[in-house]
Amino acid sequence: MAFPKMRLMYICLLVLGALCLYFSMYSLNPFKEQSFVYKKDGNFLKLPDTDCRQTPPFLVLLVTSSHKQLAERMAIRQTWGKERMVKGKQLKTFFLLGTTSSAAETKEVDQESQRHGDIIQKDFLDVYYNLTLKTMMGIEWVHRFCPQAAFVMKTDSDMFINVDYLTELLLKKNRTTRFFTGFLKLNEFPIRQPFSKWFVSKSEYPWDRYPPFCSGTGYVFSGDVASQVYNVSKSVPYIKLEDVFVGLCLERLNIRLEELHSQPTFFPGGLRFSVCLFRRIVACHFIKPRTLLDYWQALENSRGEDCPPV
């Protein structure tokens, strides 16, 4: 009789230990649902120094960023985010930020905003799980202050964007309304593992499949879509995955995703650099500031050089 009792006690201890480990890890998990705090409304704290009515941009690039990513923002300002004309079309770049509890970081961003005039900010905690709020803030800004933009791109701070090739493809596409493109995700499912960065509970999203959406690393849409998404977003249940949330809005609007080109141009997984390859892509992920500067310089230095036909 002693052996079964000891075995039962051993099993109970194992179960108890597993439960203790689970809850201790959950309390330390930075991606649990309780880790994000958001406000659905609020005034803009910072607005960029630009007037779209006087000089309507062809392409507005909205870059999600955080207070600690100054090096990333500076590298972007010196490369693909520099305000300039491409094929006679004006491009403008703006950075999307929330707020931080650090007084020093707040002051630094205030000074940066005064110097560059390219920061859009609202009063919500700047954490990963508020990326939907950050993205919708940018879309709201286009809706309210820059509806004249022909196209909008939402992207991230660790991206290489070939704005020259993107502009060329958009001009060839000749689409001005209800257009949305990027790295298409057409058959994605919610991740239910609590320790995943992309965990979504049944209470947050009860369905078993996501609608078609584009990877949040970089997607492009015609200017009219900004106002349509902003208006319909008020009736769409909030989900912390911003690319999925935008996909839900597009589903409500019956806007279908389209390929930008017959060949792949968006690379959310990263790529090995070569001048000829990067001339024919639109977006590449996992690019550090120093690397971005090096890639950009290599592309600038090779202007006029021929590449083998694809």
UniProtKB/Swiss-Prot annotation:
Lumenal topological domain residue ranges: 29-310
Cytoplasmic side: 1-7
GO CC list: endoplasmic reticulum; Golgi apparatus; Golgi membrane
Disulfide bonds: none
Gene3D superfamilies per record: 3.90.550.50
Reactions catalysed according to its record: a globoside Gb4Cer (d18:1(4E)) + UDP-alpha-D-galactose = a globoside GalGb4Cer (d18:1(4E)) + UDP + H(+)
Cell compartments where the protein resides: Golgi apparatus membrane
Main location: Golgi
One annotated GO biological process: protein O-linked glycosylation
Keywords in alphabetical order: Glycoprotein, Glycosyltransferase, Golgi apparatus, Lipid metabolism, Membrane, Signal-anchor, Transferase, Transmembrane, Transmembrane helix
Ranges annotated as spanning the membrane: 8-28
Pathway recorded for this protein: Protein modification; protein glycosylation
Membrane topology (UniProt): Single-pass type II membrane protein
Glycosylation sites noted in the Swiss-Prot or TrEMBL record: 130, 174, 231
PANTHER family: BETA-1,3-GALACTOSYLTRANSFERASE 5 (PTHR11214:SF265), BETA-1,3-N-ACETYLGLUCOSAMINYLTRANSFERASE (PTHR11214)
Function: Catalyzes the transfer of Gal to GlcNAc-based acceptors with a preference for the core3 O-linked glycan GlcNAc(beta1,3)GalNAc structure. Can use glycolipid LC3Cer as an efficient acceptor.
Recorded family membership: Belongs to the glycosyltransferase 31 family.
Protein name, per record: Beta-1,3-galactosyltransferase 5
Organism: Homo sapiens
Lineage: Eukaryota, Metazoa, Chordata, Craniata, Vertebrata
Underlying gene: B3GALT5
